[in-house]
């Protein structure tokens, strides 16, 4: 995900900005209820602030993308944080007529001794205007909170999802309507690849 973090003479808490990440899940049960998880995350401009995490992902109903994730995070460098974490998550991606609806949310806690809570979510509705084009246009809302930083954004969104490729490219304008976390309002370009 690419986003201009901006520069300010009076720095505010940051929540967002350009970042990279990936995740692999390996099913340990045929039902899909228990999986091994391995992922990494880092701010694009501060790789040493990122981490790699390994853990177990439990979904009570294997066909429903909602569950609990227990991880051990290991920092890449001194700017990151090594700790255990517990995350509850859930979401849906469905189509209603010409509308594509995406809802996702997660909340959790990081640290066994020095505990910090976090939460974030997204709600987006996009419409396919032309059956011949794999482009959908709509609007979305994004929210996130962690110690010392919180924000809510709304804005238009456009997504390209080729039918024969597991790739989604989205371009949003995120207008910050609540919170004081950097970066300021602006465009966000996201690239997601799934297998």
Write out the residue ranges for each language-model feature.
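Outer-membrane beta-barrel strand-turn architecture
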Residues: 28-30, 44, 58-64, 94-98, ...
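Transmembrane beta-strand segments that form the barrel wall of outer-membrane beta-barrel proteins
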Residues: 1-3, 9, 33-44, 52-54, ...
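Membrane-embedded beta-strands that build the outer-membrane beta-barrel scaffold
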Residues: 24, 36-38, 56, 70, ...
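Outer-membrane beta-barrel initiation region
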Residues: 1-33
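Detector for outer-membrane/organellar transmembrane beta-barrel domains
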Residues: 73-140
């Amino acid at each position: 995900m690419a986003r201009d973090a901006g520069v300010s003479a009076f720095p505010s808490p940051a929540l967002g900005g350009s970042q990279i990440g990936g995740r692999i899940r390996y099913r340990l049960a045929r039902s899909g209820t228990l999986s091994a998880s391995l992922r990494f995350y880092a701010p694009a401009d501060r790789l040493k602030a990122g981490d790699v995490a390994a853990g177990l992902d439990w979904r009570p109903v294997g066909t429903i993308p909602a569950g609990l994730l227990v991880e051990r995070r290991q920092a890449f460098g001194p700017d990151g944080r090594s700790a255990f974490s517990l995350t509850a998550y859930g979401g849906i991606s469905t189509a209603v007529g010409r509308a594509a609806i995406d809802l996702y949310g997660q909340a959790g806690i990081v640290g066994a001794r020095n505990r910090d809570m976090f939460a974030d979510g997204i709600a987006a509705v996009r419409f396919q205007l032309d059956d011949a084009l794999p482009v959908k246009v709509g609007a979305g809302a994004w929210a996130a909170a962690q110690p010392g930083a919180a924000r809510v954004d709304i804005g238009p969104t456009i997504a390209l999802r080729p039918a024969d490729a597991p790739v989604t490219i989205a371009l949003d304008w995120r207008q910050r309507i609540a919170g004081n976390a950097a970066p300021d309002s602006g465009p966000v370009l996201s690239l997601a690849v799934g297998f």
